[in-house]
Amino acid sequence: MSRVAAALALALLSACGFQLRGDVGTGLKTLAVSNDVPSQVAVEVRRQLTGGPTKLAANAKDAEAQLRILAESTDKTIQSLTGAGRVFDYRLSLKVRYQVSDAAGKSIVDPAEIELWRIISYSETAPLAKEAEEQLLFAEMRSEAATRILRRIAVVRANAPAR
């Protein structure tokens, strides 16, 4: 009976169109990643490209395209206060400015900006736990920003006229 239930569940999942996201493909054979400022997003982009169809080029001369991280900043601001005037929530934000150009230096993606944010509650009784949660949320935002950049490159590449 359990085999029938498992087979039925598998059939329902495949019928709904569910599939795993898979590797982030850019449609490029090689991509060089550089950063004008210290950037954890650039590190995350390199990590996401490892093992995928797009190879990481050592320099822009050897690459089909170049991704430049122009700026990256994080911010933590008070979102809300309690009735006693104590911090209740913080807003964490990440801004990344980037540009993509081809091997000839022509812009494929004009300078663009991604801004991500998360709300985190604050607790005076567990400051170390909240600090760890904050770092985890920033890491998650960096990963999401890297994925968005690579997907944007893939969309622009897919919509580019054939040469």
Tell where the protein language model's regions lie, with residue ranges.
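N-terminal segment of the mature soluble domain
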Residues: G27-S73
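C-terminal/domain-edge helix-coil "capping" segments
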Residues: L128-R163
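Bacterial N-terminal signal peptides that target proteins for export
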Residues: M1-A6
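Surface-exposed short loop/turn segments
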Residues: R68-E113, W117-Q135, R151
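Acidic/histidine-rich, surface-exposed loop or edge segments in extracytoplasmic proteins
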Residues: G25-A32, T125-E131
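C-terminal motif of bacterial Sec signal peptides marking the signal peptidase cleavage site
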Residues: L12-A15
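Bacterial signal peptide processing site
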Residues: G17-L20
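Sec/Tat-exported extracytoplasmic proteins
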Residues: L49-P53, V100-A104, E124, R148-A160
